[in-house]
Amino acid sequence: MAGLLKKIFESGKKDVKYLERKADEIIALADETAALSDDALREKTVEFKERVQKGETLDDLLVEAFAVAREGAKRALGLYPFKVQLMGGIVLHEGNIAEMKTGEGKTLTATLPVYLNALSGEGVHVVTVNEYLAHRDAEEMGVLYNFLGLSVGLNLNALSSTEKREAYACDITYSTNNELGFDYLRDNMVVYKEEMVQRPLAFAVIDEVDSILVDEARTPLIISGEAEKSTILYVRANTFVRTLTEEEDYTVDIKTKSVQLTEDGMTKGENYFDVENLFDLENTVILHHIAQALKANYTMSLDVDYVVQDDEVLIVDQFTGRIMKGRRFSEGLHQALEAKEGVTIQNESKTMATITFQNYFRMYKKLAGMTGTAKTEEEEFRDIYNMRVIEIPTNKVIIRDDRPDLIYTTIEAKFNAVVEDIAERHAKGQPVLVGTVAIETSELISSKLKRKGIKHDVLNAKQHEREADIIKHAGERGAVVIATNMAGRGTDIKLGEGTIEAGGLAVIGTERHESRRIDNQLRGRSGRQGDPGVTQFYLSMEDELMRRFGSDNMKSMMERFGMAEDAIQSKMVSRAVESAQRRVEGNNFDSRKQVLQYDDVLRQQREVIYKQRYEVINAENSLREIIEQMIQRTVNFIVSSNASSHEPEEAWNLQGIIDYVDANLLPEGTITLEDLQNRTSEDIQNLILDKIKAAYDEKETLLPPEEFNEFEKVVLLRVVDTKWVDHIDAMDHLRDGIHLRAYGQIDPLREYQSEGFEMFEAMVSSIDEDVARYIMKAEIRQNLEREQVAKGEAINPAEGKPEAKRQPIRKDQHIGRNDPCPCGSGKKYKNCHGKEA
């Protein structure tokens, strides 16, 4: 252990030496840079950009660029970065975490690597915890960037897509972590590439990096959509399919557990739901509900595939016969079963897109962060983000007095002592900041101070504008501020007149937080830049942390010594507290690591889907190649399921293939039983694919190429988005329920990974099938736009068109039942002159 500590300490010393050497090189250019005029200094930015274009790396430019940014800060802001700030800037440029104590000027430090990395033209994101800080920093530091000829954008929640796009197009963009994550998710839901707002993620500097990448790491960002408006469609579809007759209206393929409507069944469906063509894109929702109702009623059996318990449909594992708690069938099949069995149909709001901060920020090419407290989480930053934590020395020696903890037997005794301490310090004009872990603690202390007539402010992290204002004045003579869990991070407490003589800022902690880092943050508010200050934590044996980690012996020991109301200062207790904190931190790290392992399953799937969507949206030419692969996989599956080359021909179900092709891919009768007999499985596939290719060729002639390309995009995006949202929903249910299945030797994570993979593969097959069906069977409507598809609605193209001129009927044409009637009425042939025929 000692050897390990020695190694770490020595590597830290090496880091500092290297940074000092580099900072000295920058300082050596100070006079030369100071001699440049404002215009010449600004011209340096243009020169640097050109050099990057010609192949110089940002590392090559670091010393010169930092010197220019440093001189720029002196002229534009009246601030001249110290040597330690240059060192911090180098750490950030290298994609690591600079641990800089409070008041050491982190905001100014960040301007150096931000300026350097903005020269690449790829955009730099500066990330803060709230919009107030993003706004403040963009405004204040923007003066420097603009002075040096760079553009600065501020990305806020209230902006329109156009305004956001402009903010992201700037060299430097200030934003909150939430807004960046949500914009990424929204970008992957758009249907036109012009609607995307973000550029590829290049470099981000995160302020208060521990808060965002550790404390909020487990928080998922979720965009949820309305669940199906009502469950009535499930009930209607269920009622409809129960009126159908097997063979006449539908066929069942036992092997693949699939059900197909026949032509008669389709006509009945169109009449029942009062639509012209079930395969129109505007009727996808109806067709989907019918398909699931057919499956629920005619391929799934109660007490075999599922059971009903307590008004709920529960899935039965086909291999073990166990009930799979928490698992729901996806794509509305579960709701179809609920409608079939007459139990309550559950419809939650749907998660349309989701990502955690861990996975969002790991997508940047380079990530850096700064904070006053990161050393305690060093292992986590290294393991999960591949970032090192490097301590930057302070500009001036810290002279703050950090006193040992005072420990009381009861909470009541502790709070009385806290209030007495505040009153004494207040009386001599010393400013006091009181840190609490919970809101109720701050209210309790506040009421005690009111009774003593001590004027004070209470801060809960709700109103950022007012918060910053209170924190600004917290260092004035006699000020008392009670803050919950370090509200007001990011705003410095500067000492007012006469407070140095009173001892500087006193920070009082009312209990230890479960994380040492949060305690250190509170301590760090005092003694900034060599100011005097004092910090004191008050503990009691009844505190949450002490209760959780067995302090009964200590409590009885204190009572034995008759110290029920008095405090003790004990190194032993302080050590016990610290080891309890270490244990909690370890547990929290493990839990965050586990969340990441679960989230990684969805991350890999999300990357596949988002990449596919991006390719579709960006495609300039026909997507036929992609679609034909989907059709091929679908035909391959249907043929091999019904006519496997590993089975004797007498076991083949050729009629099953014909039923599927008739219902989903080609006009009825295109392929007959005679066509398929006496062929190999491979020949059957090729025959069907040839017929589909000919039908596709014919379909392409119906529209100009750009419009047909648009039709293909509409179908692909509609199907992929619908299936993906259903899949996320199903994965949510799986994850919620997987721990309920931890029987025997089963590892829930392994189970989640393998089932999640199976579900993803099933979704991909389902996408293939639906795309094949809609491409081959949907009628092409000329003004069906992607935007309408994204909202799940499509305008009836017959509305608002000039009335078509009626044409004479020619008997010699072959007219399909779903083709437009040649008389020009705008109706389908089967609903017009087809009736008479």
Curated annotation (Swiss-Prot):
Keywords: ATP-binding, Cell membrane, Cytoplasm, Membrane, Metal-binding, Nucleotide-binding, Protein transport, Translocase, Translocation, Transport, Zinc. It is a peripheral membrane protein. Residues 791-837 are annotated as: Disordered. May bind 1 zinc ion per subunit. Its cofactor is Zn(2+). Transmembrane segments: none annotated. Its EC number is 7.4.2.8. It is found in: Cell membrane; Cytoplasm. InterPro entries: Helicase_ATP-bd, Helicase_C-like, P-loop_NTPase, SEC_C_motif, SecA, SecA_CS, SecA_DEAD, SecA_motor_DEAD. SUPFAM superfamilies: Helical scaffold and wing domains of SecA, P-loop containing nucleoside triphosphate hydrolases, Pre-protein crosslinking domain of SecA. The keyword Zinc applies. Zn(2+) binds at C821, C823, C832, H833. It catalyses: ATP + H2O + cellular proteinSide 1 = ADP + phosphate + cellular proteinSide 2. The keyword Protein transport applies. GO terms for biological process: intracellular protein transmembrane transport; protein import; protein targeting; protein transport by the Sec complex. ATP binds at Q85, G103, E104, G105, K106, T107, D492. Residues 827-837 have a biased composition (Basic residues). One of its GO terms (molecular function) is protein-exporting ATPase activity. GO terms for cellular component: cell envelope Sec protein transport complex; cytoplasm; plasma membrane. Residues 800-817 have a biased composition (Basic and acidic residues). Its main location: membrane. Signal peptide: none annotated. Part of the Sec protein translocase complex. Interacts with the SecYEG preprotein conducting channel. Has a central role in coupling the hydrolysis of ATP to the transfer of proteins into and across the cell membrane, serving as an ATP-driven molecular motor driving the stepwise translocation of polypeptide chains across the membrane. Belongs to the SecA family. Monomer and homodimer. Part of the essential Sec protein translocation apparatus which comprises SecA, SecYEG and auxiliary proteins SecDF. Other proteins may also be involved. This is Protein translocase subunit SecA 1. It comes from Listeria monocytogenes serovar 1/2a (strain ATCC BAA-679 / EGD-e). The lineage of its organism: Bacteria, Bacillati, Bacillota, Bacilli, Bacillales.
